[in-house]
Amino acid sequence: MTIAGGGGARRWRLGSVGGTPVYLAPSWLLVAAVLTLLFLPTVQLAAPRLSTPVAVLAATSFPILLFASVLAHELAHGGAAKALGLPVREYVLTFWGGHTSFGSDLRTPGVSALVSAAGPLANGVLAVVGWGLLRVVEPGLPAVILASLTYTNAIVAVFNLLPGSPLDGGRILEALVWKVTGDRDTGAIGAGWVGRVLAGVIVAWFLLVPLAQGRQPTLTGAAWAAVIGYLVWSGASQSIRLGRARRSAAGFDLRPLLRPAQVVDVRASVAAVPAAPWGVAPPAIVLVDPAGSVVGVADPAALAAVPGPVRPSTPLTAVARALPATAVVTALQGSAALGQVARGIGASDVLVAVSEHGVLGVVPRDVLLAALQPPGR
C-alpha cells in the first residue's frame, strides 16, 4: 500500500484491479470508526457473552464488509465502462462512498446509462445473495452481520437509483433526456433540478414523517437529513453548473493555452532531465509510468535546486508531486474540454493535456483562470 497525493489530496493505494489503481482516502478510517461504534450495540445484543474487546472486533466486520460493497459498486461502474471500450483511470473510496474516474467522456446516452446503472445493480445483486444466505445461516451474530449488510446493500441500490443528480439514477435520467432531446446539457441541467427537489424531499422525509406520527424528530435523524440533503443538493447544483458551462463553451479551445512539457519516465533520476539552454525557460516536467500514463509533474525550480553531485542518485519522484486523474485532460475543444478543465482546476494547479499520441503540453491553473475570465474583467 503506497501513499499518493495530488492537488492537496492524500490517499493510500491499495493495489489495482484489472490494471486500474484502487485508492483509499484516509478519511474512510473515520467512517469505519463511527460505523463500528454504531454497530457495537447490535453486536452486544446479538452476542451478550462476548467481552467488550471481542465485541468491538466483531463490530469492525460491518464497515469492512461495507467497504467491500462500495468497492463492488465502483468496480461495476469500471467493469461496464471497460466492456464498452472506455478506459478507467482509478477507483477511489472516500469518506462519502467512492467514485470512478474514466479516461474519456461517456460518449453516448446508452453508454452513460449502462455505466451508471452497473453500480446499483451490483449492490442489488449483493442484497439478493445476502437474502438467500440468510435463509440458511443459523441465528446468531453472523446472521445479524449478514442481515445488516444485506439491508444496507438494498438501501444503497434503491437510493442510488433515485432520479436526481448526483446519484446514479440522476445520470440515467440525464442520459434519457440526452437521448430524447439530443442535448446532453439539457439532461445534466434537468437531472440537477430533480436532484435539488430530491434533496428537499429527503430533508422533509426525515423531519416531517416523525411529526406526522406524533413523534419529535430525533437529533440523529435531523443530522442525517442535513448531511444527506446537503450532499445531494451540492451534487445537483454542480450538475446544473456543469450543464450551463458546457452549453456556453462551444467555442472553448485549450490548444492555444498549452505550454511545452518534457516527458520523463517516472523511474528516472533527476540527472535524466537535461538542463534547458541558457536564456530559455525550462519546460514543465511530466512523469509517465512504463505504460505511458501520466502520474505526476516536477517543478523545474525544484529540479534546479538539487545539487549536482547527488542528481544521479536522486529519484525524480523526490521532487515531483502526483497528479489526480482529473488533472489529465483528453478533450481539447468545446464543452467536453471545458467540463474536464472545470473538474481539473479544482484538484490541481496544473493540468496535463494528452492524446492517443502522448502528452501534448501543460496548462497552469492561473493561465486557465485568466483565459476563462469574461472580457473586460
Regions found by a protein language model. Name each.
Residues 2-34, 56-113, 147-152, 156-176:
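Small-residue-rich helix-interface/hinge motifs
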Residues 263-282, 288-289, 298, 304-308, ...:
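The conserved cystathionine-beta-synthase
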